């Protein structure tokens, strides 16, 4: 049994953040509906930095996922995705800052197809990320306020992104 703070009280706990990371990547792998993943990022004040864009709202994040606003949609570009969390580093308990800085390393493998190629192409990377998590003002649950892909390190044999 976990010893967690009540939802909405203080900064997110290690257990909450680890559970969040697992759920986050499961949802990305399954290409869940935007309504099921967009609430996991802060709406006002979001900074979501990926190699191809910086997103600043839930609306922009949703467009980045499924297409719109000049984004092709990562759900449209990649398939058979598998994210494997390698590590989640959280500051020690007792930190009283409202934003918790988290270091995440995730292995990401997927396939993509560039028409008119006869076959799809495997890609694989270790993604080194920094997250800042806060509690949602609406739900009290942890959400991503800042998400930065610090490095995408290609696996042996992977073409560049």
Give residue spans per PLM region.
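A broad structural signal for short, well-ordered beta-strand segments within beta-sheet-rich domains
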Residues: 12, 16-17, 76, 85, ...
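Intrinsic-disorder-associated interaction segments
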Residues: 6, 10, 14, 54, ...
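A solvent-exposed, acidic/Ser-Thr-rich amphipathic alpha-helical stretch
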Residues: 34-35, 39-98
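Short beta-strand segments enriched in hydrophobic/aromatic residues
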Residues: 41-42, 104-110, 148-151
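Short beta-strand edge/turn micro-motifs at domain boundaries
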Residues: 2, 95-101, 115-161
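Soluble ligand-binding/transfer domains with enclosed cavities or grooves
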Residues: 68, 72-95, 104-116, 121, ...
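Short, low-complexity N-terminal intrinsically disordered segments enriched in polar/charged residues
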Residues: 1-35, 39-40, 44-48
């Amino acid at each position: 049994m976990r010893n967690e703070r009540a939802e909405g009280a203080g900064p997110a706990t290690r257990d909450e953040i680890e559970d969040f990371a697992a759920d986050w990547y499961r949802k990305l792998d399954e290409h869940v509906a935007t309504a099921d993943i967009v609430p996991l990022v802060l709406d006002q004040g979001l900074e979501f930095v990926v190699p191809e864009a910086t997103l600043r709202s839930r609306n922009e994040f949703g467009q980045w996922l499924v297409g719109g606003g000049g984004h092709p949609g990562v759900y449209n570009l990649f398939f058979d995705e598998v994210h494997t969390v390698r590590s989640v580093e959280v500051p020690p308990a007792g930190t009283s800052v409202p934003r918790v800085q988290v270091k995440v390393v995730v292995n990401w493998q997927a396939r993509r197809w560039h028409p008119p190629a006869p076959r799809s192409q495997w890609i694989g990377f270790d993604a080194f990320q920094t997250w800042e998590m806060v509690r949602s003002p609406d739900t009290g649950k942890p959400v991503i306020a800042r998400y930065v892909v610090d490095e995408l390190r290609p696996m042996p044999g992977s073409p560049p992104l």
